[in-house]
Amino acid sequence: MIVNDYLAKTYGPQPCWELVADVYQTERFAVPVDYKTVNRSIREMSSAFRLAIHKSAHGFVQIDAPVNFAIVLLGKSERVGIHHCGIYFDGRVLHALPGITVYEELSVIRDTFELVEFWAKA
């Protein structure tokens, strides 16, 4: 994966989920998500992706240690829950925020988010 290709991009209203879909579409395989692009909220988008990943219809399993191309699900706290995501690659997490895509060390991610889950294709 050429990380700089993704760092040069900006994504729409729900940038993190759109980045994950873009990376999987480009680098791996599409992750079909039953979600319409009209009136999407962060919670609805998160729900759709979590269902696509957690139901394992696409062969995803939760793993303890990250591997390249693992989807990283993130949450600020248990109360808030999972609401952000990225892609693990070479010790860092590629994730998108409104207006910018960043590639941060996993240690920085762990300092920022209380909840960190890794999901990989089985």
Each predicted region: which residue ranges?
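Residue-level signal for pocket-adjacent positions within structured domains
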Residues: 6, 101-104
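Short, Lys/Arg-rich amphipathic alpha-helical interaction segments
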Residues: 103-122
